[in-house]
């Protein structure tokens, strides 16, 4: 449960709060479950704070420091539970922050630093992550319609992530794990691949594969070729390091089998 003194001090304004944090660096503020809706917390010093289950709907947290902050289960989104609109976290430092199971639907996280952040089970539907730094972030979560354009996703864990209709154009996906992810309708124009894990996923409905830049070979499973029914550009596969024998012999076989399976029965 939140420390009410901490809560009241924060509500008086960022200037006094930041002075308190500077003078009492040993204190880890307990703001868990607090009602912090619609506050102006721009540039607030919230590193190490416990904000789990807090209601931050409509709160402006742009450029706030949230390094190692605990936001598990926090309400950040515009929705029925928090009626104050989505929080603004643009440019915020959320390095190593815990956001597991947090509702971040529609939240502005553009240019935010989320290096190593824990986002398992979080809802990031329609979230704005434009140019966000998600290096080595755990993103096994819902990212439907999210804007990840030009985001740094190098080394990120996106296994089983729902990236339906997500915008990944220009995103850095080197070393990212996309195994079992749903990329239906995803936009990959000018994305960067290299040492990217593409196991057991369907790439047939993703757009822009022919414009992807390859910094090196990636890992593409045969299961991905079958699930995609061979509907992956040859140039993409070749640049990703798929052996020429696979392109010459296995890929045509997969494509023919797919055509036969959809042919009308006479």
Segments from the language model and where they lie:
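Conserved N-terminal substructure of TIR/SEFIR domains
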Residues: 23, 256-266
């Amino acid at each position: 449960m939140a420390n009410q003194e901490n809560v009241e001090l924060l509500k008086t304004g960022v200037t006094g709060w930041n002075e308190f944090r500077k003078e009492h660096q040993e204190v880890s503020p307990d703001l868990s479950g607090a009602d912090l809706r619609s506050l102006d917390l721009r540039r607030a010093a919230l590193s190490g704070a416990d904000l789990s289950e807090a209601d931050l709907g409509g709160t402006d947290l742009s450029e706030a420091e949230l390094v190692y902050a605990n936001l598990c289960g926090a309400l950040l989104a515009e929705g029925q539970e928090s009626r104050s609109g989505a929080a603004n976290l643009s440019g915020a430092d959320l390095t190593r922050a815990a956001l597991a199971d947090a509702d971040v639907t529609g939240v502005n996280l553009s240019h935010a630093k989320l290096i190593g952040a824990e986002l398992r089970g979080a809802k990031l539907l329609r979230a704005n992550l434009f140019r966000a730094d998600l290096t080595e972030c755990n993103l096994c979560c819902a990212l439907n319609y999210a804007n990840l354009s030009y985001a740094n996703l190098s080394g990120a864990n996106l296994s089983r992530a729902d990236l339906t209709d997500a915008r990944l154009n220009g995103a850095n996906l080197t070393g990212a794990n996309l195994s079992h992810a749903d990329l239906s309708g995803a936009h990959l124009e000018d994305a960067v691949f290299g040492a990217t894990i593409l196991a057991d996923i369907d790439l047939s409905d993703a757009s822009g594969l022919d414009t992807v830049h390859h910094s090196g070979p990636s890992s593409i499973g045969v299961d991905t070729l079958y699930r995609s029914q061979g509907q992956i550009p040859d140039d993409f596969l070749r640049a990703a390091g798929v052996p020429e024998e696979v392109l010459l012999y296995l890929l045509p076989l997969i494509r023919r089998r797919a055509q036969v399976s959809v042919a009308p029965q006479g």
